[in-house]
Swiss-Prot record:
GO terms for cellular component: plasma membrane. It is found in: Cell membrane. Keywords: Cell membrane, Membrane, Transmembrane, Transmembrane helix. This is UPF0324 membrane protein spr0034. The lineage of its organism: Bacteria, Bacillati, Bacillota, Bacilli, Lactobacillales.
Length: 336
């Protein structure tokens, strides 16, 4: 059986949902195309779940396309530029990532939340939302319903942050520089960071958007050490005392992601325009939307809602902790 005859129907279903979601995401950037894709997929699940000819293509899209998307994501990271501009925000970023991951670990231990779901919520809250979840899910072998649940939790607090942060920043008397650092650190998805910073700029005729985006990109770099650590930890759990294979410890798609980041950094240092990589970054985003479509189509919405209480609570605790840690660290380093 050829690849297309086996996977074509499922991939086509994901493609159609993704095109619609991409269009809707352009109109409602606070929500974003990946969230539209996952929810449209879940709404269609009751009607399409009986069509078994879709299964192979959905599995390919939710796993392989997601890995390809993560590799292409590397072409959006110029490591030297991010470090040069974003280094002043590193103490805040490292503090918030650490506190969120510690909370996620303790929560799953004391409240019996599934470890993989807690991990996804933790990395999604602390690093960069859907992109971090997309990179982490294949590494820890998370199930589709766990990915869908984590994305849904992150989405809720993303929208909430984009709506209330400009008002909160005004109430706290944040400077323009302070709000850029606050939004770039305490909001976990690029679209929501953009929405919050743009709203602030509209209120105060400032230019915080670029700074907030660079802080966000600096956070994105944490995907590399976090996924490598989780991959090693997962391999240790599976292999126990058996010898570990390099491919199992460090999945190839993560290594390719790192190589893509290094290649981008090298080429831009040699004079290649960053716009050269724009098509690859856009393709990465679209493949993530396709993967989310597949995950949505494989997820029972009713069952997910019934089991979401603990994950929403974890998301809320992580979100509040990140806000408080960000503001506390900003006060300490004098960027308020």
């Amino acid at each position: 059986m050829s690849f297309l005859s086996k996977n074509g129907a499922g991939i086509l279903a994901c493609l159609l949902i993704s095109i619609l979601s991409w269009y809707l995401g352009g109109f409602f950037p606070v929500i974003g195309a990946p969230v539209f894709a996952i929810f449209i997929g879940m709404l269609l699940h009751p009607f399409l779940s009986s069509y078994k000819q879709l299964d192979a293509g959905l599995t390919f899209s939710s796993k392989k396309l997601l890995q390809y998307a993560v590799v292409l994501l590397g072409f959006g990271l110029n490591i030297s530029q991010v470090f040069a501009v974003g280094q002043s925000s590193l103490p805040v970023i490292l503090s918030t990532i650490s506190i969120a991951l510690i909370i996620a670990y303790l929560f799953q231990r004391f409240f019996a939340l599934d470890t993989k779901l807690a991990t996804l919520v933790g990395v999604g809250s602390s690093i960069c939302g859907g992109s971090a979840i997309a990179a982490t899910a294949p590494v820890i072998h998370a199930k589709e319903k766990e990915v869908a649940q984590a994305i849904s939790v992150i989405f809720f607090f993303n929208v909430l942050a984009a709506l209330i942060f400009p008002t909160l920043g005004t109430w706290l008397h944040l400077s323009n520089e302070g709000f850029a650092l606050f939004a770039g650190t305490a909001v976990n998805d690029t679209s929501s960071v953009t929405a919050a910073a743009s709203a602030w700029d509209s209120l105060y005729q400032s230019n915080t958007l670029e700074s907030a985006t660079i802080v966000k990109l600096t956070r994105t770099l944490a995907i590399i050490p976090i996924t490598l650590f989780l991959s090693y930890w997962q391999s240790r759990q599976q292999e126990n005392k058996q010898s570990l294979q390099l491919k199992k410890v460090f999945p190839l798609f993560i290594l390719y992601f790192i190589l893509a980041s290094l290649l981008t950094t090298l080429l831009t240092s040699l004079g290649v325009s960053s716009s050269f990589f724009t098509p690859l970054k856009q393709l990465s985003k679209f493949l993530i939307v396709m993967a989310m479509s597949a995950i949505g189509l494989k997820t029972n919405l009713v069952a997910m809602v019934k089991s979401s209480g603990k994950s929403i609570l974890l998301g809320a605790i992580c979100w509040i902790a990140i806000i408080l840690t960000t503001l506390g660290m900003q006060t300490l380093i004098g960027i308020f």
